[in-house]
Amino acid sequence: MAIDEERPPGPRLALRGISKRFGAAQALAGVDLEVYPAEVVALVGDNGAGKSTLVKIIAGIFPPDIGEMRFAGEEIRLRGPKDASAFGIATVYQDLALCDNLDVVSNLFLGKEEVRFPRLMDEEAMERHALEVLATLNVSLPSVRVPIAALSGGQRQSVAVARAILGSAQLVLMDEPTAALGVAQTKQVLELIVRLREQGLSVVVISHNLADVFQVADRIVVLRLGQLAGNLWTRETTREEVVARITGADEGKVKAAE
């Protein structure tokens, strides 16, 4: 079955011919990518395949050397992460960038504190909004006033995601969201990704864990040596085929991205 047969009209994010070079190293070469509303796309590939570079371009950290980027049908040029955030692109990095000594509310609103006259932080409003966004994700915490250091890995990941979508996020980028997590915590994070999709958000997940990928992703996009090596419906492919695309074992299909 062709992938286009079940896609809704118009991708939320569309990249065309994205290339990026760092000195003599060609990180990306002519990569196309589309992500639709209410879709989870897994970005997989070996180390050095270009996954992180592609996500950093989407997040506004790096500008592409060549290529076009469209969001909701509009061509955009991102001059930095603030531009990406303004378009509704949120990023959850592998290190989460949380402050262990601050509580959940303070982490959620760090740098974007809600204030009331005369320029005083509105602690009650922030706590109320924190509880609301965590409830939409079905995240259970002992309290929103406990320090981040007191939370489990899965709970910390949930707080990082809640912070990312606080506001008007439409696309969430997640870098290795289940890395170094135990079984129960991994299950919690995967359920969180599914809930993001159910709420209509688009999610791009970088992962080396194919078991997690096959559990939550609608599509799997494979990069190899900076080039697109596969664009596969999860339900219609196998781990063996994905690994073959990642490693180049099936060279006849490496350039035949569906």
Language model features with spans:
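Glycine-rich phosphate-binding loops of nucleotide-dependent enzymes
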Residues: 2-258
